[in-house]
Amino acid sequence: MEKLKLGYLKEFCNRTMTCPKEIARIIEENEHKIRSCYSESFDISREDFVKMVLKDSTFIIELFLRADKKEKYKNDYLLSNPLLNRHILEDLILLENQLPFFILEELHEKFSKRHSENSLFIDLSRNYFYSCIKSIPKVMEKEKGKKKEVKHFTDLIRYFHCPTKHKDFGDSIRDLSTATQLYETGVIFKLDEVGGLLDIQFNKWYPTEICPCFTCSWLLNCLPCLKCFQCLERTQPLLKIPQFEIDDITEGLFRNIMAWEQCYYPSEAYLCNYMGLLDYLLDTGEDVELLVEKDIIVNSLGSNEAISKMVNRLCLEIVEENSCYSELAQKLNKHFDQCCNRNMGLLKSTYFSNLWRGIATIFGLIIFGFSLWSIIRPYVV
């Protein structure tokens, strides 16, 4: 790895037509500021510290510049090696490995800015992480060209996942039914293709609050083609969730971001709140399977059970002061606690789960009606 870093340092100097001493001078000027960004002191000399930051910072910037033009550098040793590229990504998101973001920005601004289509280092970083981390919402593409003050890459990736609009925080979630339990009470899980990862919404038509029989879920279950009529779909209790692709780096990524949030954003722990909500919804493999069927979860990890265990592990040592999903949880609990919703859900799943069962149920009711009429008719006429 050391040899690779030295090679990238040489390439960076060739690209920017500068020398390592000139880059080192900028780092020396900021040495005290860089050291102050770490909670622990470095017991190394000034010269060794500057060399370390020089190699790491130029390696990262050169990597991002090459990744931004993959076609040109498709034969690059690192970019053409998926396994090595994955290890580099894991190192970059590791909380204890972070370089202060400001020094990377300053070096890019002074030396490599003119050699990149992205004038801001944050945009260069966004392009790299967006291509590697599937959970970063596409909505973040709209944020290009905006400068944002971040401390390091873990903080930056958290920012990429955060909602574009501030969410209201309420009490922490104490109790919530699982995805399959909610589904049994008539809640329809739907993929939200527009919102960011954390933009989860529960919409329920007001008349169904008063009388659950006003829902058209049974009809839409039998005739899915009618879902194109918005007026019918609105009658269903809809839980809209954006897609979440889970792979083998997801656990490490979220563990680092959640640890960072617990220390520095305890009152705005968006990712901790999100994972806490999933911890309630995804209690078993069956819950995961339901969301996989709805295309809400893309399982690149393996078994559905592995995902539920991963989510449960991530939330083991998390302490929630509040939650941005407090109101959502209250609405879902209110829906679940109404016995009428459970009865309607049972009716739908038992008698109207598909077209043929729905037709059989209707014919059965018609025959039952005629039979009943034939019995009582002599006494009525």
Where do the language-model regions lie?
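Hydrophobic alpha-helical cores of multi-pass transmembrane domains in eukaryotic membrane proteins
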Residues: 362-372
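Membrane-lumen (extracellular) interface motif
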Residues: 372-381
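Non-transmembrane
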Residues: 1-359, 380-381
